[in-house]
């Protein structure tokens, strides 16, 4: 206290540690796109600020609490920032300015801010940050926070959740404006609404979570995952249990200790474990790709990751082992039969390993389900020369992966055959595997010789930490309670005596009937299910990936922060993150094993009466003969259902005994269910194109498309509309391979895609522009990011990953264009020269 008083009297500013954070403003911009001879550019025409420095977000009231300012030039907004910084210093507050898609709105002013402040950043990529701090004398004096990470579905979805819908239709983005263009009252209303949705959403979060405080926003609560972290810390961390020695400890403290004990102690161990990590099992059956089939069932696993958060013992205390010993351990793993695995599904194998193994003549296992349907397991993305990642990843994560690979830690293959993002065969390959992945490998592939090169192993297994399983149990029960509320609530007072997990503010709102049904549904779908689904992500984080730095306003990966064998010890000592990476590997590894076993059981029981077409982490698409019933599908999977239910009961026994107030029965977790396909349990027609790209037609002739890059705005003409139009006069077998095929160009009128130009922060506009009112003025501003309409090219075979698929599919690879219906013309498919194909 004396030191703080002395510094205050001397006029020193207050440090980050004793100046509290407060959301003081919400920020947004409106920009104008302008077509030049060199392409699209954009510049800002309006800066919007909702000043909330005198408002407690817990008491926020739409319109009453708002204090909205409009600025037409970037320097005016920067002056506002300067004034807010000065106010924060006087009041011992670190102000936070929140925005949605922050870097889009900071683009035209970041160079101006960089002229006055140093900057520090916590980022996912150079264009997607969590927070950006303005620094003076090494101290944070203002923080920008991107609220996008609380709900990534858009401001409109955020507004729907909190009951303040985003304004639509009042700002015509096709009109040319300048900073001097007079704006209408409707346009200003539209612009203001975006800076009102965020405080309304934050108010909603405070009302929905009794433990949450407004000073957590932008500090302790930055992302949806951090909401889960803080919920656990405030509601569960201090729950106590009695240890074997009779002493009592909190489950949170025990978890922290376990994270410290199980963290890698050397760079080699870190790199080995990182290289062993696999994502969810996403695959396409090469034998069935781009083929239209009928009578397709969709099977989903109930809460797949939670099955292995709660149903799998964790290998602990790894140590390096000689290759000869590892060889014997690995041979025992691959010789473990399916019956043994299912009988001890909580601990299916007797050893845990992280190993590097060389295989000779690796190929799909003859006579297996994976041979019958040509399904492969090993991801192409783990190999050193793979250029385009199978999944979108952050620059930091890609840099960490590349750096580890350059250090020699990567899979490699000689004469490999790749397709659909997977390795089908290789004359020789070196793989990095856990015990779960090695066992799965033995079910999918066969080989002539296997030689273990190096690795670590353990025979010690323990239950997963109660701190994490308690989160899963608690949120599963909360999810079920809210699901029940959604069925019962009709905007009248509701008897809530049956509910034990709902927070008091939610109970109060339900019992008085003040909530709308839309609010209740949004709370269930967005908040409760969002938190439930966020638990796994915490354990899968690489806490040693490099960070981002800012130089003169330019954000980039700090290459010096990448861990190496020379810097690892120092970085490990400084690391305070509590993540159990081995646990995350076993959670996702369990999900991969679950799908592998399911495929094998379906083949054993139903043989060629079914075909597994594709899978995605927790789901399978299965073509069925017309006489295959739902009951037959589930009976084939019954051994797996019994195994996971028993595994969860064994693994969760301690938590249920010591923490009954938060424990759950976890009914049906890990079990497959046959999903509705429209009004029936089968799709009439279905086609898998490649991973995560599929089209289905239900029995009511409604089309369902899943494909990255193809938006489906409500009420718009979309790819689904286009296919329905073609199906009026053509058969599914003719339409689907062309609509979702290789080298198919889909124009903006169908794809509704946007491209963007990313100017440098120093790029400026200085030109005379005539606005839509006919007024000409000189525009001098830093450039904004230009968003402009664009089409999408599907299955571009000039890209290596797509070209590899052609080994297995017989399709038309000529360039084609989808032409939408309109202006008296029917929908059709043409070649690039204009000839009509369909």
Model-based region annotation:
Residues 18-20, 35-838:
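Conserved acidic
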């Amino acid at each position: 206290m004396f030191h703080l008083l002395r510094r205050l009297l001397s006029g020193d500013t207050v440090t980050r540690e004793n100046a509290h954070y407060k959301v003081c403003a919400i920020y947004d911009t409106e920009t104008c796109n302008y077509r030049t001879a060199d392409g699209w550019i954009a510049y800002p025409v309006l800066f919007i600020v909702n000043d909330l420095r005198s408002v407690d977000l817990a008491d926020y009231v739409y319109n009453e609490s708002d204090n909205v300012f409009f600025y037409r030039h970037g320097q005016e907004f920067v002056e506002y920032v300067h004034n807010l910084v000065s106010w924060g210093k006087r009041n011992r507050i670190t102000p936070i300015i929140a925005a949605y898609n922050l870097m889009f709105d900071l683009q035209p002013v970041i160079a101006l801010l960089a002229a006055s402040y140093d900057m520090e950043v916590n980022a996912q990529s150079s264009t997607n940050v969590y927070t950006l701090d303005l620094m003076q004398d090494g101290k944070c004096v203002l923080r920008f926070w991107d609220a996008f990470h609380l709900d990534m579905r858009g401001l409109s979805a955020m507004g729907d959740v909190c009951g303040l819908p985003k304004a639509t239709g009042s700002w015509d983005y096709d009109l040319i404006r300048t900073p001097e263009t007079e704006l209408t009252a409707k346009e200003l209303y539209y612009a203001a609404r975006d800076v009102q949705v965020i405080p309304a959403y934050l108010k909603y979060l405070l009302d929905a979570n009794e433990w949450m405080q407004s000073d957590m926003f932008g500090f302790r609560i930055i992302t949806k995952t951090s909401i889960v972290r803080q919920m656990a810390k405030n509601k569960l961390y201090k729950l106590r249990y009695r240890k074997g020695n009779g002493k009592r400890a909190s489950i949170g403290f025990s978890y922290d200790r376990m994270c410290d004990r199980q963290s890698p102690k050397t760079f080699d161990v870190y790199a080995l474990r990182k290289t062993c990590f696999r994502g969810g099992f996403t695959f396409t059956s090469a034998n069935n790709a781009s083929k239209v089939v009928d009578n397709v069932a969709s099977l989903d696993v109930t809460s797949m990751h939670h099955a292995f958060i709660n149903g799998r013992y964790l290998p602990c205390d790894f140590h390096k082992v000689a290759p000869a010993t590892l060889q014997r351990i690995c041979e025992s793993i691959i010789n473990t039969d399916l019956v043994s695995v299912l009988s001890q599904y909580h601990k299916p194998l007797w050893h845990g390993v992280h190993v590097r193994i060389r295989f000779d003549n690796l190929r799909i296992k003859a006579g297996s389900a994976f041979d019958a349907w040509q399904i492969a397991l090993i991801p192409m993305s783990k190999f050193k020369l793979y250029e385009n990642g199978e999944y979108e990843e952050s620059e930091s994560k890609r840099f960490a992966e590349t750096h580890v690979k350059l250090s020699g830690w990567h899979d490699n293959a000689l004469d490999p055959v790749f397709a659909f993002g997977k390795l089908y065969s290789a004359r020789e390959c070196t793989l990095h595997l856990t015990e779960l992945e090695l066992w799965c490998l033995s079910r999918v592939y066969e080989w002539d010789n296997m030689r273990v090169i190096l690795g670590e192993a353990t025979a010690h297994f323990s239950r997963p930490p109660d701190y994490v399983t308690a989160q899963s149990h608690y949120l599963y029960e909360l999810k079920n309670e809210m699901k029940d509320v959604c069925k019962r609530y009709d905007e009248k007072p509701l008897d809530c005596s049956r509910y034990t997990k709902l927070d008091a503010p939610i109970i109060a709102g339900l019992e008085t009937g003040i909530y709308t049904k839309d609010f209740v549904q949004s709370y269930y779908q967005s908040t409760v299910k969002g938190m439930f689904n966020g638990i796994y992500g915490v354990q899968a984080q690489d806490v040693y990936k490099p960070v981002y730095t800012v130089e003169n306003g330019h954000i980039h990966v700090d290459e010096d922060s990448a861990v190496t064998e020379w810097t690892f010890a120092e970085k490990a000592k400084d690391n305070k993150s509590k993540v159990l990476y081995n646990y995350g590997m076993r959670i996702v590894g369990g999900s991969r094993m679950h799908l592998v076993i399911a495929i094998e059981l379906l083949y054993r029981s139903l043989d060629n009466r079914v075909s597994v077409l594709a899978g995605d982490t927790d789901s399978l698409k299965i073509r069925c003969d017309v006489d295959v019933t739902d009951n037959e599908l589930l009976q084939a999977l019954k051994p797996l259902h019994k195994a996971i239910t028993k595994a969860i009961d064994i693994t969760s026994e301690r938590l249920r005994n010591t923490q009954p107030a938060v424990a759950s029965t976890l009914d049906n977790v890990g079990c497959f269910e046959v999903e509705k396909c429209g009004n029936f349990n089968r799709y009439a027609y279905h086609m898998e194109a490649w991973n995560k790209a599929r089209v289905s037609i239900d029995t009511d002739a409604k089309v369902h498309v899943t494909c990255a890059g193809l938006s489906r705005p409500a009420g718009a003409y979309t790819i689904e509309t286009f296919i329905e139009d073609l199906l009026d006069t053509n058969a599914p077998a003719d339409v689907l391979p062309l609509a979702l095929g290789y080298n198919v160009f889909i124009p903006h009128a169908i794809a509704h895609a946007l491209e963007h130009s990313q100017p440098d922060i120093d790029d400026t506009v200085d030109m005379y522009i005539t606005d839509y009112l006919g007024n000409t003025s000189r525009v001098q501003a830093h450039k904004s990011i230009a968003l402009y309409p664009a089409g999408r090219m599907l299955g571009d075979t000039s890209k290596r990953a797509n070209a590899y698929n052609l080994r297995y599919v017989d399709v038309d690879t000529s360039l084609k264009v989808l032409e939408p219906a309109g202006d008296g013309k029917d929908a059709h498919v043409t070649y690039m020269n204009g000839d009509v194909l369909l």
